[in-house]
Amino acid sequence: MKVDRGWGNCVIMAFLPERRWGTAMHNFLPIAYFENQFVPFEEAKLSIATHALHYGTGAFGGLRGIPDPQNPHQVLLFRLDRHCDRLSNSARFLNYDLPASKIQSVIVDLVKKNQPTASFYIRPFVYTSDLGIAPRLHNIEHNFFVYGLELGDYLSPEGVSCRLSSWYRQEDRSLPLRGKISGAYITSSLAKTEAVTSGFDEAILMNSQGKVSEASGMNIFIVRQGKLITPGFEQDILEGITRDSILTLARNLGIPVVERPVDKTELLIADEVFLSGTAAKITPVRQIENYQLSTNRPITHQLRDKLSAITENRDPEYSDWVFAIPV
């Protein structure tokens, strides 16, 4: 049976004849946080009448963690504080006051209770939890849950093929794109499925002005003449935490950085193209439409190696980006 799901959605491994990149084959962590308590994952269930299921009035985050390669008694989370801050800000769009400190406390306790032994991913989610109908964000209850799953490489580290999507990235004047609002990901899902059913791994979306915006759930970078170039916030992109990390690393490594509009044709003549995201990490792009891109990727590999060293707590210069949790 052929199955493809959108970014971050789950499939069951038994139904797949082979691994398809960009889907997650899930081994869920046994304990989840749901309705203000820690419960077995299989007991965390929502009513079919939950408001957020009908109107997309939820927001989510996602962060990676690994067992510490240098210390078997702790696990490492990458940029935990930034992820919690972003989700707290996203919750404000839902008229929900959820402090970042509360989110962080729950995530830390969740990791301690699960004691993961392999690379993993944490998904916190805030949502309107009332039962019933009528789209609104006032006079309504809110809640949040957190769960985790083991997750290795989400996209092929050797590189992915991308289709230029017929779907366009939404505009900030229509949706709060600085929050990871669940309802907004219908466009990502349409673009992803269009790409995969056409024989590609990923989708690249333009904005309403025809400029490059982002992939289905990742930011995009190109390299031209030694400069690292990426669309700016005015191109209706998500304020990616991995994106921010890459820009900081590049500047500190002496790589010229430019944030500006990127034309579609620039993707085809760039020296290097890569995607970035919490799940995707840094993933090279090897093909766009029927154009094969260069496999010589010195800046992509330099940044990926640097980011890997930081996430594994092997780079003391960026130790404040890594949150260690004893288990």
Residue ranges with predicted function:
Residues 15-109, 127, 132-327:
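Helix-start/capping segments and mature chain N-termini
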Residues 110-115:
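Phosphate/pyrophosphate-binding loops at sites that engage ATP/ADP/AMP, CoA/4′-phosphopantetheine
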Residues 116-119, 312:
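Generic structural signal for secondary-structure transition and capping sites
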Residues 119-126:
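ATP-grasp fold ATP-binding core
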